[in-house]
Amino acid sequence: MEQFQRFELEWEMAQWDRMETFNLSESGITPLTLQELIGNDDESLQKFLDIPLDYAGQRGSLALRETLSDMYSGATQENILPVSGAAEANYLVLNTFLNAGDQIVMTWPNYPQIWGIAKNLQLNIVKVNHMRDRNWALYIQMMDEVVTENTKLIAICNPDNPTGYVLTRKEREAIINAAQKVDAWILADEVYAGSEITNDTETKSLFGEYDKVITINSLSKTYAIPGLRLGWIVAPHMVTSEILKRKQYTTITTSTLSDRLAAHFLQERNRQKILARTRTVIRKGAEVLEIWIKNSEGHFSVVMPQASGIAFVRYNHDINSSEFMKQLYQASGVSLLAGDFFGIDGYLRISFGRPEKYVQKGLEKVTEFALQYNR
């Protein structure tokens, strides 16, 4: 039996088991409550209390699929497949389209779940770098050079995890051109679309810009509702049908309650309220992070993210990032993520998508810990 590649990032977070004093490792936003989602209207509350807790349809309810399709230009409900979070979406897509020996091209750094799935499927993994010395811009020439006839899928994350970088039009076009050249699929993780820091323009979905694009999203990041464990895949109808065949071996359906709630609060008027709240939270957190960096006297530096509630922070100390992470947690109860999880030592992924004072106090603990090491 081949050795199984565990998901190292999630494995480490599971060891903390939410016992940390300051959680700067989570990649989402301060979660919404049911009261915030439903409001104080007794009629609305009763409507949800009366939901029979039966199975949801395997394709999700028509109401949810229609609501989700309204978010994507040119999409219909047939292009939508609800799943149990973006993590299941990634797992299903790779298991549907790729076989041992196939090549997968990934922009990097990227959410490492896809890398782990690819390892377990025995795929040939090729990384195209976001360049550290160019504010995380994508090395688009490399994208064109690495694709071959064996390239079956190009996986991107836009906005990016862990850097918060948003692809430019030129970079998007380069990815599409590379995929078209070898007739490859594009898998676009778009879970941070809508969490923009520098402007109010929602990051444009790649869906519809090429006929072999599969996009995924979820409630967990921008929408600040990870506890409902709901995500969705947007793809050509024949593709969603193929993916459903695999889903029937995993979760079969999503949660009925999650389905009905999402169909309500993802209606455009409600959705925009959630996006406004998210942007308020992360912009305040980003200000705290930026001030902390400026006051760090060279101990830390960062290319400020354009979107998301996370930043990929460089530290100027002679200690491995995994050791930094572990020793920090043991010393002060602060959790953050080592750059090692993304294959880049010397960096830390730090969340700022929490209340300002919480983030500020957590960052102060990071500074106190770092001061004991020589630069």
Positions of the model-derived regions?
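N-terminal small-domain helix-loop-helix segment of the aminotransferase-like
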Residues: 2-85, 92, 268, 373-375
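Conserved glycine-rich beta-strand-loop-beta hairpin in the small C-terminal domain of fold type I
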Residues: 25, 263, 279-290, 301-314
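PLP-dependent enzyme catalytic core of the Aspartate aminotransferase-like
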Residues: 74, 144, 327-336, 342-375
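PLP-dependent aminotransferase-like
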Residues: 96-156
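A short helix->loop->beta-strand "cap" motif at the edges of active sites that frequently abuts
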Residues: 102, 123, 181-184, 211
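Helix C-cap/helix->beta junction micro-motif
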Residues: 121, 181-182, 332, 373
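Active-site phosphate-binding strand-loop segment of PLP-dependent enzymes
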Residues: 132-201
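Conserved core segment of the aminotransferase class I/II
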Residues: 212-283, 290-291, 364
